Regions:
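Conserved nucleotide-binding/hydrolysis micro-motifs of P-loop NTPases
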Residues: 15-18, 73-76, 98-99, 128-133
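Alpha-helical scaffold elements adjacent to nucleotide-binding pockets in ATP/GTP-utilizing enzyme cores
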Residues: 20-28, 92, 107-114, 138-139
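SF2 helicase catalytic motif II
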Residues: 72-74, 83-124
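Inter-Walker segment of RecA-like/P-loop motor cores
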Residues: 30-77
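Walker A/P-loop
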Residues: 1
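Conserved Walker A/P-loop ATP-binding site and its immediately adjacent core
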Residues: 4-36, 74
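Interdomain helical connector at the RecA1-RecA2 junction of SF1/SF2 helicase-like NTPases
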Residues: 122, 133-178
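Short beta-strand/turn micro-motifs composed of small residues
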Residues: 12, 94, 127
Length: 178
């Protein structure tokens, strides 16, 4: 891994998303590493939260394990049972980042804040829409400036798809406070 990263955690909002991840030979396309992980570390499978939290904790303790895939909920529950320092030298990628909020009662936002303030973890924030649907900010301005924004328009993104059969794009307009 680069930049002294020893572990990667990918957190997705739903099991269906994470369970669709497959091993991929990225090195064939010029990347320095393949997407290759221990399938036991894909926690986006049916089963109870306690078992998944235990597996998450075991992953963090095992120096030879490097990639874990879990839901936002598993990340939140496991975070409650771990010392924040175990996330040092870890890349935490949060898919559907607009689920985060700077509001005090947003648990995913609290986890993110602790990672940013108390560790050297790298954060990758991924979302197709930075819009939450309410008036709460995803991040406070002091935190947002810490991120490097990478934006692709639909045409740039679609050029990367090889097997896309169809795509539907909808627009929704809101009035008043949302």
């Amino acid at each position: 891994f680069n930049q002294k990263i020893k572990k990667v955690i990918v957190a997705v909002p739903e099991r269906a998303i994470g369970s669709s991840f497959k091993k991929t030979k990225l090195s064939e396309y010029g990347y320095f590493a393949d997407w290759d992980y221990n399938e036991d570390n894909n926690l986006c499978t049916p089963g109870g939260d306690e078992k998944k939290v235990r597996a998450f904790k075991n992953f963090m303790e095992n120096k030879s394990e490097t990639i874990l895939i879990c839901t936002h909920a598993t990340l939140r529950f496991a975070f409650n049972q771990l010392d924040v320092s175990v996330f040092n030298e870890t890349l935490v990628a949060i898919d559907e980042f607009h689920h985060v909020s700077s509001a005090i009662e947003n648990r995913l936002g609290e986890v993110l804040n602790a990672l940013m303030q108390k560790t050297n973890a790298h954060i990758v924030a991924m979302t197709g829409s930075y819009f939450r649907g309410d008036s709460l900010p995803v991040l406070l301005p002091k935190d947002e400036i810490k991120f490097t924004k990478v934006t692709y328009n639909y045409y740039e993104q679609l050029n990367g798809y090889t097997f896309l059969k169809s795509l539907g794009i909808g627009y929704h307009f809101y009035q008043g406070r949302y």
